[in-house]
């Protein structure tokens, strides 16, 4: 038989074709399906169904970096860019579980600029030498000079009487409701403290999980009374959630001791300003009042003053240029934006059409401390529950300083959201 007859003449059906047309294929397929379902049920009964699920829906491996500051691995949450370079989006957040979950770095994809670090931080290798827990860092104070330190059980500074000038462990004594206690001073012989006691604390546990468009981490700290440096015992949890355009940070502090305690919380992120310089950056702060400072003591007076229509007024909806001058102010009486239920601060880079929005999601956040030193290419915008020197005598009542009193069993939650997007799209939501 030639090729033509093979192609056009009568030919035998294949065995598979004859079988499929015989009417016996459908019952066979149904039988195979039933066997598969029985197998899956047996796997579930033996606790193996998660293995099958993992093969179908593999979990993203979250890399960890050994020998991190504080003796715990550095943790990096990451995600894959999804906008194909059309919109700015978060790519990763690097955390230091051995140093109070310091938000060490936030990376973003910015159209026209590529991968951009949003926080002013050195390399991890350099950070390891700075965050060594020795000398000036004996109480963790170097954590406030990079990345974004989480601040508990108070934000900013306490004041008191120096009780130890030992360079390795300088202390000061302060008072709350008749109780005297000692906290680390920021320098030998200093009457001001470091910014909280969480700075060099290591986590007790850290868990991670995959989100629909990112990853999250949940850390637990069990510092107790910080070796007797605080009036009662604490349990602290920190949750970090990374997605394309949102980065949520949540801290919850619970009084697990038998006595009341004062408590405040905050975050000190140090944002890198645009490469084109601070003169091109625009800042919007939802307030026209600041905490008044006694320029002799550099401590608050307990009063607020208006800065409306002055160089310190950054309340314009479109933002105001930073300019070359320095800023070191605590903005109070935060007002909500017209389209949002919470106060919103903004940092804009018109050259890149980049907008960062810092949203105070907890009503306990009473102020934003803004620090932008003269001729430096960074700015810190700190959402805090308490003001500077919150246990000082200048406050009319303990609660007017922003510190809350936690009875045994009570908790305080602090939560903020960092949003990223284009000025042209997100600004209208302000």
State where each predicted segment sits.
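N-terminal Lys/Arg-rich, disordered targeting/topogenic segments
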Residues: 1-22
